[in-house]
Amino acid sequence: MSFTIFGGRIMFNLLGDYITSRTNISEESLNIIFSHFQPVKARRNEILIGFNEICKGYYFVNEGCLRLFTYNVDGNETTRYFGFKGGFCTALPSFIEQTLTHEYLQAISKSELLYISRSDFLHLVDTVPQFAIVYRGILELGFVNAQKRIYGFQGFNALEKVRWIIKFQPDLLLRLSNKMAASYLGISPSTLSRIKSRI
């Protein structure tokens, strides 16, 4: 499905597809949703939400990729989540609770995004039932993915982690650099390269 509102621009196509793939919704309601999102461009490596900041909004990825990461006690980057094209991404605990973040939200490539403020997002949840369904789906997917990763990684060595990723999230190894994928797996890039060459 294509949408050409806002002067004929098609910046809302992917967001429209995301919503209509999850719920039945009228064009009128879609346009209400679209009117609350603003187009934003991010540079490669740009930090969108900093450590110890309060998250004020949500991003939908039209092009590019976002990630949530922090630094471990050894000073190494640890990535918790990647937001790929066609999906939502934010520092969710801070977004919900309005507490300080313990991570960074970064564009890892030049990205075209749609941004919605927290107040507008919650307004849509309260006033557009289909958007509430979408939000519930985001929360459920986030919970399931987090549980898979936590329990999937428990007690795994490096090889088992890579095999787990190949089984459950194969796109990560195809779409990301070794450095980024390794930061998600909690192993070194050289270890990841060595394992990939053997599999």
PLM regions with names:
Residues S2-Q38:
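Cyclic nucleotide-binding regulatory module and flanking cytosolic helices
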Residues T4, F156-I199:
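Phosphate-/nucleic-acid-contacting segments
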Residues Q38, C65-T70, E112-L113:
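Short beta-strand segments in beta-sandwich/barrel cores
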Residues P39-V40, K56-V61, R80-Y81, Y184:
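His/acidic/aromatic-lined binding-pocket segments of jelly-roll/cupin-type domains
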Residues N45, K56, F60-R67, K85-G86:
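Glycine- and acidic-residue-biased ligand/ion/polar-headgroup-sensing regions
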Residues L48-E53:
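Short phosphate-coordinating micro-motif centered on Lys-Gly-acidic
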Residues T79-R136:
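Cyclic-nucleotide recognition modules
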Residues G142-Y151:
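Short, Lys/Arg-enriched N-terminal segment that forms or immediately precedes the first helix
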